Amino acid sequence: MKKIFAMIMTICLMASALCVTTFAEESTDDFVITVSAEKEDGTVVKLEDYTSFEAGWNFAMEKAKDNNYLDNNDYVRIVVDLLTDWEADADGVFGDSDGEGFECSTICIPEKARVMLNMHDYTIDRGLEYHEWDGEVICIYENADVIINKGTIKGGKSFNGAGGIHIKDKANVILIDVHIDGNSVRGDDGAAIAVYDGANLIMNGGSISNNFMRASTTFFDIEVSPYGALYANESTVTLNNVTLSDNYTFDSAAEGVAIYATKSTVAINECIVSGNAVAQEGRYNAKSVIAGYDSKFIITDTDFTNNASDGGDNCYGDSRLFYFEDSRLTMEGGKITQNNPQELLYFEDSDADINKVTITDNASVVIYVDNDSDSEKVNMNECTLNKNASIDNAPDIQVETKGTLAMNNCAIGDTNFEDKGKVEGVGSLFGEGSLTNILVIISLIASGVAIFLVVYYNKKKAAPVAANGATDTEADDEE
């Protein structure tokens, strides 16, 4: 009997151990979020694992917005690690608005929260089929301090303020290798990202791609046009090694299909801008790919290829690669090639310094300057222009007011001017193609000098000729 009882107990203990082990393994596998805290010395303290996105995110945001909790524990910020893809439910809902981490079904980062979200190459997808109010994927509130690492944000469709990430007043946001893909807005701004009122965005690596925008119609049948895959208003944006590609519109009145900035500073460094605002089936051209109003742009070593459309189906009105009004552009290096808007660079009451930029093989007017006076000036220095021809054979260089465009040491080939007299530095040795011209002229002078010296040297070597036509030797023989 004792043996039987012992056997039963052994079996029960083994079964219990197996159940505990199995439960533990299943629980670990079911974790979707880990919440930790980063200390001032860089170490990370694990706080909790969660099997529910909603519960884990709410807990993280409660801690992240509590600056007393963070400071008293010497924590710099709360760290959230995604352990799998995060998808909204069938209605596009991420979580209940009763929690700290959600509002109007959107993932929220509260005011003054300090957060790092490590996505580990996973995707956050709202999966909306139609546009709705607050249809963005993530909303970052005022004065928040946020870092997001390595993942994809997609599936947002909003009527108000951003499809992907909505960044509110004075928030500081750093995105590292983050891809904002396949989001949209209707009648509002920032299909991918919208940055507002004193906020600061730094984006290192990653992409803004395949986001779209379309107009909406008000109750009074007034059409409201959308602006920008990336939209900045009174803010600062820095893009380093970012790809902006294949962003598009269903409405030809859209502006800044890739980037639209008003009263902002935008720095674009070593980026690729390609395939934006290209008209094709179901897609239209737009007023501009990059648009700046009362803004400052600093663009360095960035390539612009295959953007915009002019002529053909789904092309209506003017289209530009760059449109600047009351703005300032500094552009250093890079290429502008194989684009097809009506104009590449359009300046209205704006200043620019464009240095060492190659502009070739575009089916467009190269530059159009519409400044009111010569106090606003566009300077092109050591640039290369060649093989640019607009569809309607309009002049490549068009200037409304004399003296508002200067071309210095530029290599210009196969380029025509509406009026060379309005462009400083063109039509003289130090103007059109001056580097090439100077080299050619120097070469010609050098060749002439060389020929003269050779002739002179040969004459010196030749024997002197006597008055009767014989050489001195012949004259001596005759004597």
Residue ranges and their predicted role:
Residues A17-D30, G433, N458:
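Sec-dependent signal peptide cleavage junction
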Residues F31-D81, D85, A90-S97:
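Acidic Gly/Asp/Thr-rich repetitive segments characteristic of extracellular carbohydrate-active
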Residues D91-C108, L128-C139, K157-K168, S184-Y196, ...:
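Extracellular beta-strand/beta-solenoid scaffold signature
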Residues K461-E479:
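Cytoplasmic C-terminal tails of single-pass
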